[in-house]
Amino acid sequence: MTFYDHTAIEPKWQAFWADNHTFKTGTDASKPKFYALDMFPYPSGAGLHVGHPEGYTATDILSRFKRAQGHNVLHPMGWDAFGLPAEQYAMDTGNDPAEFTAENIANFKRQINALGFSYDWDREVNTTDPNYYKWTQWIFTKLYEKGLAYEAEVPVNWVEELGTAIANEEVLPDGTSERGGYPVVRKPMRQWMLKITAYAERLLEDLEEVDWPESIKDMQRNWIGKSTGANVTFKVKDTDKDFTVFTTRPDTLFGATYAVLAPEHALVDAITTSDQAEAVADYKRQASLKSDLARTDLAKEKTGVWTGSYAINPVNGKEMPVWIADYVLASYGTGAIMAVPAHDERDWEFAKQFNLDIIPVLEGGNVEEAAFTEDGLHINSDFLDGLDKASAIAKMVEWLEAEGVGNENVTYRLRDWLFSRQRYWGEPIPIIHWEDGTSTAVPESELPLVLPVTKDIRPSGTGESPLANVTDWLEVTREDGVKGRRETNTMPQWAGSSWYYLRYIDPHNTEKLADEELLKQWLPVDIYVGGAEHAVLHLLYARFWHKVLYDLGVVPTKEPFQKLFNQGMILGTSYRDSRGALVATDKVEKRDGSFFHVETGEELEQAPAKMSKSLKNVVNPDDVVEQYGADTLRVYEMFMGPLDASIAWSEEGLEGSRKFLDRVYRLITTKEITEENSGALDKVYNETVKAVTEQVDQMKFNTAIAQLMVFVNAANKEDKLFSDYAKGFVQLIAPFAPHLGEELWQALTASGESISYVPWPSYDESKLVENDVEIVVQIKGKVKAKLVVAKDLSREELQEVALANEKVQAEIAGKDIIKVIAVPNKLVNIVIK
C-alpha cells in the first residue's frame, strides 16, 4: 500500500514557498482585497500548543481560498512580546527579557512555519521593536494632546507579588490577579488613565455595524453598562455639604430611607461625627484591603458603619441616616446611593441587618418578608400615587428639574482605562515631568523613546517602576536649564496589541504609522479569528484606539474588525477522581479498558479538560508534525467538529485524518488519470466543488472535509479518474493540506508553479441534477429487484424495463400476470397468480 512521506514533502514545499515569496501580499489594484487576521500570540517559553493552530489554520484556509478566487490577500503574523511573563522570567533567572523574548519568537516562528501557514513574513511585527513602539508612543502623545490621557490619584488594584497595579479587567471573579492568581488590594496611587469613557456611547452604538458573535457584543454592552435615569442631590443636615446620587429609579425616591457612601467618597471624613470617627476609620481601612469584585459579591454578608450624619430627602424632607458600606464603589456612578430597601434586595438585606426603615412605594408583595422587585402602581408617593413606572419616572424627573434638586442623566459602568504599569518590560510612556510643575510629551522627532537596557529590573517597591533606578536615562535638562524626570511607568501589554493590525498594512514606514492610501485599501479587517477570552479587554481597547485614530483622520473606518470569529478550545485528555478532582496523566494507568490512580488504586473517570502543564496533558504540535505531518494536524483540527465548539483531542481522530490523506495520495498517484470523461463522477464532483466552496466561505470546514471524503470514496469505485476532476479535487483539498496539495498538483501538471494562484474550480449547475433514479420492483409485495433507470420514464416505459429484467423474468416464468402497477421514479408492483 502506498503512503506519502510527509518528512520529505513538507520541508520541500516550505522551502519552495520561502524561496519564491509565494505568499507576498498582492498589490494588483484591480483585484478585490481580503485581510485575514489572527490574534497574534504572546511568545511564551512553552512554545505553541495544539490549540494555537486551530484558529491559524482557519484563517490560512480562507487566505488560500481567497488567493485562488483572485483576491489580494493580506495574511500577516507578529508578536505581542511585552508583558509580565518575560519580566518575571528575567527576575527569576537574571537573564535579559529581550534575549528571552527573541529566543521564544524564533521557536514560535519555527513551529508556525512547520505547519505550512501562508503568512507574508515581510510584514512581521514585534511590539518590543523600537521601530514599532515608536508609533505606540506616538498614539499615546496624540491621546495626551486630546486630553484623553491624563494623570490621576486613583485607588488601584495593587498586586504586591507583581509589584504593579492592574486594570479592573485583569482582576478575576475571586479577587485575584489574572496573571499569577495573586491577592489584589485597593491602594491610592498616581496613575496614567485613558479616557475611554469619552467614547462609551460610540463603542456601544457601533457594535451594530459589525458582524460579531452576539455573545461577544453582549459582553461589551454589559461592560460599557449604559443606564438611563436621574441625578438627585441630597443635602447633609446641619451642614453646607451635599452629595449626588445617580438612580435608574427616581420614581422610588419617596421610598429612600437611608443613603450609603463608598468608604473612599470625598465627603466621608467631612460629615463623620466625632463619636463615629474611630469606627468609620477602621471600616475604611478594612475596605481598602478588598478588591472591587470581592466588595460587590452579592452573596457576601452586608457590612457598614453609620457616619453619624443625616441627609434630607428632597422630595419629602425626611431625615435619612448616611452610612458607608464597601458594596458601594467610589469608581462606579457617583460613589453614593439612595437606598430603597422595599424594592431592592441588597438594600433590603442591609436595612434588615441594621434595623433601618423599609417603606413600600410600589403596590404588591410583602416587604416585611422580602424586597418587592417587580413593577406595580405607585403608593405612599404623594403626586406619583397610582402611576405606572414610565409615567412616574417622567413626572419625578420633571419635578426634580423644576425644584433644582436633580436632572435626567445617562451613566455608564465603563471606567477610564488604568494605563500605567510599575514594571520594566513595557513601552516607556513618552512624558517628561519638569521641576516647575509642568509636564510635556516627548516630541515626535525624539521618538521612539527607547527602553534602556538595565540589569536591575526588580520593582522598586516605592510604586515606581525599575526605570526610576536608571538615572542617566531618567534625568533630563531642557534647553532653558530646567531639570526634569522622565515618566517611570510603562504601558500595559494591551498597548501594542491595540493597533498592530494597522502596522501590518505598512510595516516599514518610517514617516508615519501607515500610509493613508494603504489604510483605505485594506481596512477594515475582513476576518479576525481568536479566543473569546479577549471579548472585553483587547477588543474594546482596540476599538477605542481605532475610534481616536478615526477622529484624528489617521484611519478611514469607524471600526477595525468587520467580522470576528471565536474558535473553540481544544481540550486535553484528563481524569477525575470520585471527588471531581483532576488527576495528572502521569498518575494514571489503564487496565482492562478502565483507568486507575497509580498511587491510590481508585478507578478514575475520563473527562476532557483544558490542557495544562500541571495535568501533563499538553500536546506539542512538534510531536504531531513529526509523527503524522502538518497536513494531518491541519485536517484533523478542522474535522474535529464545528470551529467554534470546544472538543477533546483524540489520537484516533488524528490517525483517521492521516489515513484519509494517504487515500487521497493513492487516488491521485496510482489511479489511471484519463483525458476522457465517462460521466460517472459528474454529479459527485460538481456537488463537491459547490459544497466545499460554500462551506469554506462560511467557515464550516468540518463539513467541507466530509464532502471531500465523499468524493474520494466515489472516485475509488471507478477504474479511471478524469484529469479535470483530479486537478479540481487537488485544488479543493490544497487549502486544508497545502503540502500534499502542491505535491499532487505537480504529479498531475508538472507545471513547476505553486497551486496557490491557480483559479479556484467552478461547478456546472446542470450536472448537479440527478438524471437517473433507482426504482424497486415488487412481486407479491416483496422486493425482487432494484433498477437504475432514466428519470421521469412513463408508466409504460417503466413497465417494459421492469418486465425485461432477468431477475424479474425468473420470478414470473410460467405465472399469470394479473396486473402491473408502475409509479414513475419510485416502483413497479407486479401481481401474479
From Swiss-Prot:
Any one GO molecular-function label of the UniProt entry: ATP binding
NCBIfam families: leuS_bact
Family (UniProt): Belongs to the class-I aminoacyl-tRNA synthetase family.
Taxonomy of the source species: Bacteria, Bacillati, Bacillota, Bacilli, Lactobacillales
Binding site for ATP: K613
GO cellular component: cytosol
Name of the protein in its database record: Leucine--tRNA ligase
Superkingdom in the source lineage: Bacteria
Source species: Streptococcus pyogenes serotype M12 (strain MGAS2096)
Location of the motif 'HIGH' region: 41-52
PANTHER family named among the record's database cross-references: LEUCINE--TRNA LIGASE, MITOCHONDRIAL (PTHR43740:SF2), LEUCYL-TRNA SYNTHETASE (PTHR43740)
